[in-house]
């Protein structure tokens, strides 16, 4: 009896994990509004009522998917930002962590796009609980680096750099291959990921003036 009792929680956890995985794929592919709980249940192979054992409703399931999916990303960025190294190196580590996390879990990129596309339905809702905190940490490092001279940014605010990095990786992972003839390009192939990461680092270094002096033309906005 004790062994059987011990197996029940393990089975429940496996079922919950399967529900989260199925819901993540469906939310990423269809968006929140178009994803039905019946579809999630059918994908997992359980009855719709079984979902409510683990999640209070559809919104609760979506919130759990977001927390689970972005928890890994938040942990990697926290580690990169908190390492006791120079600001420029911490930012570079964060860039690498960002690319690695999105590539490792491509649904993250699609969830970001879906969240942006459905922004009118949740104008004040952040993408995931740690998003605003992580942005504050990144922007604080930007200001510290600019004040100390360790960073010589092209722009006086960090939004252009954040947009260039986030937009490039999200589009690269979630949408770029769809615009090409089938089979011509695999964005998740190791050599392509390595190339994208190098490009991302070069872009961020260029925009933040890491390792290169800031030119007068950049300060005045001239080409």
Model-predicted regions and their roles:
Residues 1-3, 100, 104, 132-148, ...:
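C-terminal peripheral helix-coil segments that are non-catalytic and often amphipathic
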Residues 14, 18, 22, 26-60, ...:
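Helix-turn-helix
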Residues 29-33, 84, 105, 148:
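Short coil/turn segments at alpha/beta junctions that flank glycine-rich nucleotide-binding fingerprints
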Residues 64, 78-108, 155-165, 194-197, ...:
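Hydrophobic alpha-helical connector segments
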Residues 67-72:
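Short, basic, alpha-helical segments at the C-terminal edge of helix-turn-helix-like DNA-binding modules
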Residues 103-125, 175-183:
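Amphipathic alpha-helical segments used for helix-helix packing
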